[in-house]
Amino acid sequence: MSKENKTTDFGFTQVPWEEKQKKVAGVFHSVAAKYDLMNDLMSFGIHRIWKKQTIAKSGVRKGDNVLDLAGGTGDLAYKFCQMVGQQGKVILSDINSSMLEVGKEKLTNKGCVGNIEYVQANAECLPFPDNYFDCITISFGLRNVTDKDKALASMCRVLKPGGRLLVLEFSKPIIPLLSKVYDEYSFKALPFLGKIITQDAESYKYLAESIRKHPDQQTLKQMMYDAGFDNVEYQNMTGGIVALHIGYKY
């Protein structure tokens, strides 16, 4: 079947393959201005711990080239700028211009200049040379990508041999009671918060649905192997609500 006739998930709705990117763009154009505030409210601030653990596992050192993909408002990129020093370089990349603009303004105001670039790019066809980055991170972005297999292969292409990919993403809770509470919170509280804070309940309804349609821990692990990564491992956080996958290129 050609891509023109294929459909894909947009939350719980099936949409034409080529339309998902436009619909996801609409979501993030809508939420960009309040993105950081909503992250704190929705996760009770725990997203900062998840990201801190990701940074600690990244192995980033002075002089490294780092790609923070779907980097949004720059939480990871800001720390990486400090870690690589002026000898290294961080590229904060996002497909969404609104998110990228918020991230650029935020990091510039924090004094993050000189060793960072901002690139609007599609994860499925990254505009970077082969074997270029020491480390790639994608935090809460992979589930919004239309062709995840193609994106993972693109990440593998631009990663140096010996480099590593870290995927921080919502996943499948491993505790049944937690899963029930999480479902109740996701489908009721998130759209309500979205309506109150951003006047946009639908975008946060999509968020809850997109999490449920994202591959589980083992499936994503295999997808990373299939894309060319080796020694893929994952660590569950907060009972599997979030998982950090790490894969290496050799």
Curated annotation (Swiss-Prot):
Question: Pathway it belongs to?
Answer: Quinol/quinone metabolism; menaquinone biosynthesis; menaquinol from 1,4-dihydroxy-2-naphthoate: step 2/2; Cofactor biosynthesis; ubiquinone biosynthesis
Give the GO biological process terms.
Answer: aerobic respiration; menaquinone biosynthetic process; methylation
What is the name of the protein in this document? Ubiquinone/menaquinone biosynthesis C-methyltransferase UbiE
Reactions accelerated catalytically = a 2-demethylmenaquinol + S-adenosyl-L-methionine = a menaquinol + S-adenosyl-L-homocysteine + H(+); a 2-methoxy-6-(all-trans-polyprenyl)benzene-1,4-diol + S-adenosyl-L-methionine = a 5-methoxy-2-methyl-3-(all-trans-polyprenyl)benzene-1,4-diol + S-adenosyl-L-homocysteine + H(+)
Annotated residues that bind S-adenosyl-L-methionine are located at 73, 94, 122-123, 139
Q: What is its EC number?
A: 2.1.1.163, 2.1.1.201
Please describe what this protein does. Methyltransferase required for the conversion of demethylmenaquinol (DMKH2) to menaquinol (MKH2) and the conversion of 2-polyprenyl-6-methoxy-1,4-benzoquinol (DDMQH2) to 2-polyprenyl-3-methyl-6-methoxy-1,4-benzoquinol (DMQH2).
Gene Ontology MF term list = 2-methoxy-6-polyprenyl-1,4-benzoquinol methyltransferase activity; demethylmenaquinone methyltransferase activity
Alphabetical keyword list = Menaquinone biosynthesis, Methyltransferase, S-adenosyl-L-methionine, Transferase, Ubiquinone biosynthesis
Q: Which InterPro entries match?
A: SAM-dependent_MTases_sf, UbiE/COQ5_MeTrFase, UbiE/COQ5_MeTrFase_CS
Q: Which CDD domains match?
A: AdoMet_MTases
PROSITE patterns for this protein: SAM_MT_UBIE, UBIE_1, UBIE_2
Family classification: Belongs to the class I-like SAM-binding methyltransferase superfamily. MenG/UbiE family.
| Domain of life of the organism encoding this protein | Bacteria
In terms of HAMAP family, this protein maps to:
MenG_UbiE_methyltr
